[in-house]
C-alpha cells in the first residue's frame, strides 16, 4: 500500500470544506486521509470553532498524534474503539486505499457507522457508480490534485450541498 499525498492546495480546500460542514464544535473523521488531517491540525492554531478531528489510518507512523489516531484496517471495517460511537461525527472524509468495489464496500461500513450523515469521498473516477450505489454520493466538479500525478483520474463525491460541486 502506498501513501499518495494531496497537493497543498487540495489539502487546504478539503480541510476548509470539512470545517465548514462540521460546524462549530463539530467532529470530523479522516478515514485514510492523513494529508487532510495534517492540514486540519495546521489550521487549528488560527481557528476558535472548537472543531475536533480524528485520523483513522493503517500507517502506524501517525500514532504520533496520540489519542487522535486510531489504527484502521479496511479489512476489519467495524473493528473500532468503543469510544468511536456510532453516528458521532458530523462529517467523514474517506480516501479508500484501493480502487476496488471490495475495498469501497468495506470502507462504506465504517463510514456509515461513524457519520451523522455528511460524507466526502475521495477516490478514482472509475468508482463513481459504486460511490453512488453504496453511499448515494454525487461527483463534484472540484478536481483533487496530488503531489505526484496519479495514473487514475481522481475525484471527490459528496451527499450534501457543497461548494466543491461547482
From Swiss-Prot:
Here the disulfide bonds are none
Report the locations given in the UniProt record: Cytoplasm
GO CC list: cytoplasm
User: What are the UniProt keywords, alphabetically?
Assistant: Cytoplasm, Methyltransferase, Transferase
UniProt xrefs under Pfam families: N6-adenineMlase
For the biological process aspect of GO, one term held by this record is: peptidyl-lysine methylation
**Tell me, what does this protein do in biology?**
Protein-lysine methyltransferase that selectively catalyzes the trimethylation of EEF1A at 'Lys-79'.
- Name of protein: EEF1A lysine methyltransferase 1
Q: What is the lineage of its organism?
A: Eukaryota, Metazoa, Chordata, Craniata, Vertebrata
Which gene underlies this protein? eef1akmt1
